[in-house]
Every structure is written in structure tokens, then in C-alpha cells.
UniProtKB/Swiss-Prot annotation:
Principal location class: mitochondrion
Keywords: Fatty acid metabolism, Lipid metabolism, Mitochondrion, Transit peptide
Organism for this UniProt entry: Rattus norvegicus (Rat)
Xref: NCBIfam families: PRK08139.1
Functional note: May play a role in fatty acid biosynthesis and insulin sensitivity.
InterPro entries the UniProt entry points to: ClpP/crotonase-like_dom_sf (IPR029045), Enoyl-CoA_hydra/iso (IPR001753), Enoyl-CoA_hydra_C (IPR014748), Mitochondrial_ECH-domain (IPR052377)
Protein name, entry field: Enoyl-CoA hydratase domain-containing protein 3, mitochondrial
Length: 300
């Protein structure tokens, strides 16, 4: 599966929950319907909070005093929250949001001084890249709910999500060039989300773009007033959660698989996926329900 390939590319070891039944229920140590995730015994600080209910997992970047910087500890917390029970049928969609007026300011520059050393710097950027790849390879859609500033790796996080809803007060930038650190890793996601010349202007100047500009260029999916942001992101998530997990997972994987291909190969892959979709229990259930003029009953 794509999630397997994504982790293997980084030499990651599989956590024990992926070696168990793929439909195992959520463990008590993470979250349960309507409950928040308790702090674990790990020595590393938990810089995210999570909550899951009705198939929707909310992951909140919870370090507003540090502008929700994607420090190594934050990245590890986020990675853990994304990976947890990724194959569980209880999970249909993930929303990533943040506390405070800044969605994320990107990497913590205090971790990037010469005193930290090359090995530490390598771990920071490899972990960040792994998180972005996990979002792409995850079987369920991941929605960014942005209220405020998203810069550098924070902008990269938004660009990496499948869907992004932002408040009209949000803005986006890749300002690393201003401090002598070009946003090369954010450019990977940004350059795949917006036109090349738009991406390069953002990268070369470091100047921010507004939420409306981000919408126009395709960095985000929708702009809403701040007071409607949570409602709109939740509405989208609930709609996704009401659908067949297996059908959506196949569709997401196929979309990203065909995207870099030439037209002929893309249609070949998509045609195969359509046939595979018809072999799914929910594929036949949906068609039969339509013919019988009733609501489909999804297996998960």
C-alpha cells in the first residue's frame, strides 16, 4: 500500500498497530469517540492535541507561545497523530488546525543554528518530509483548517493537505530567503500546488499572499469568514465521513498515482482503478442502492 511505501522510503520501522488487524479499534491510550487524547508517559512534550468522534479526527497544533513552530518535537507529535490507527475503519477523515493567531510559523530557527550540528538538522528535515509524505499516502483525506499566518514549513503543511479551508484573515508565505535559508523543502509542496511563477515569486521574495490570492492560485480550497471556519471545515469532513472509506481511499490513492503520469498512462491507471472499485463491496452497494432508489449502507 502507499502508506507502506512512504514509510519504507524513510527507513521507518512499522509500529506494532500496523502489524495487527487493519480494522482494530482505536486504542484507549489515544482517543475515543468524544474524548481527548491524554498525555502519555513519553519524555518528549506533546505539542499537539487530538480528538476523534464520528469518524473525524481533529489534530490541533497546540504550542501557540512558539507560534506553533514545526520543531522536531512538534513534527514527531504530528507524525504520531497522523499514523495512529491509520487503517482503522473508525477513521474517515482528519482535520489539522492550530491554537492561536498563527497556524504555523514553520521550523523552529533555534533548532537550526550551527550548534545543533548536521545530524540534528538532517533529522529535522527528514522528519518533516516524512510527515508531508504521510499526509499524501494516508488512506483518508486530510483537511487543513487555517486561521492566521502559515509560513515556510507551515505553508508546506497546508500545501501538502488534500483540502485546505482558510479564514479570510489568513495569509501564506515562504520567507526563508529573508533569513538566509531558502525554503527548498516547502517549495516541493508549494510548487505542486500553485503555478510555477507564483511559487517562485513567493520563494524569491518571501512576501506573503492573502487568503484570496491563495485561493485564486490553488493553494487552498475555500475562503470563509473567520466565524464560519470551523463550521465549514467540519461540514466538509462530515460529508467525507458519511461516504465509503474504502471507495474514498482507493480514489485518493489513484488520484495521486495518476497525477505525474502522461495522459495515456493516467487513463490506464484510472481505468484499472474503476474496475477495482467495482469489485469492492461498497462499489456494488452504491450502484444497487441507486438502482433501487434507496440510501446506500456502507460496510465502513
Amino acid at each position: 500500500m502507499a502508506l507502506v511505501a512512504g514509510l519504507r522510503a524513510f527507513g521507518a520501522k512499522w509500529p506494532s498497530w500496523l502489524r495487527r488487524s487493519p480494522w482494530a479499534p482505536l486504542s484507549a491510550g489515544f482517543c475515543s469517540p468524544g474524548s481527548a487524547r491524554p498525555a502519555g508517559p513519553e519524555s518528549e512534550p506533546r505539542l499537539t492535541s487530538t480528538r476523534q468522534q464520528d469518524g473525524i479526527r481533529n489534530i490541533v497544533l497546540s504550542n501557540p507561545r512558539r507560534r506553533n513552530a514545526l520543531s522536531l518535537a512538534m513534527l514527531k507529535s504530528l507524525r504520531s497523530d497522523i499514523l495512529h490507527e491509520a487503517e482503522s475503519e473508525d477513521l474517515k477523515v482528519i482535520i489539522i488546525s492550530a491554537e492561536g493567531p498563527v497556524f504555523s510559523s514553520g521550523h523552529d530557527l533555534k533548532e537550526l543554528t550551527g550548534a545543533q550540528g548536521r545530524d540534528y538538522h538532517t533529522e529535522v528535515f527528514q522528519t518533516c518530509s516524512e510527515v508531508m509524505m504521510l499526509i499524501r499516502n494516508h488512506p483518508v483525506p486530510i483537511v487543513a483548517m487555517v486561521n492566521g499566518l502559515a509560513t515556510a514549513a507551515g505553508c508546506q503543511l497546508v500545501a501538502s493537505c488534500d483540502i485546505a479551508v482558510a479564514s479570510d484573515k489568513s495569509s501564506f508565505a515562504t520567507p526563508g530567503v529573508n533569513v538566509g535559508l531558502f525554503c527548498s523543502t516547502p517549495a516541493v509542496a508549494l510548487g505542486r500546488a500553485v503555478p510555477r511563477k507564483v511559487a517562485l515569486e513567493m520563494l524569491f521574495t518571501g512576501e506573503p499572499i492573502s487568503a484570496q490570492e491563495a485561493l485564486r492560485h490553488g493553494l487552498i480550497s475555500k475562503v470563509v469568514p473567520e466565524e464560519q471556519l470551523e463550521e465549514e471545515a467540519t461540514r466538509i469532513a462530515k460529508k467525507i465521513a458519511s461516504l465509503s472509506r474504502s471507495v474514498v481511499a482507493l480514489g485518493k490513492a489513484t488520484f495521486y498515482k495518476q497525477l505525474p503520469q502522461d495522459l495515456s498512462t493516467a487513463y490506464f491507471l484510472a481505468s484499472q482503478a474503476m474496475v477495482d472499485n467495482l469489485t469492492l463491496k461498497d462499489g456494488q452497494e452504491g450502484i444497487e442502492a441507486f438502482i433501487q432508489k434507496r440510501r446506500p449502507v456502507w460496510s465502513h
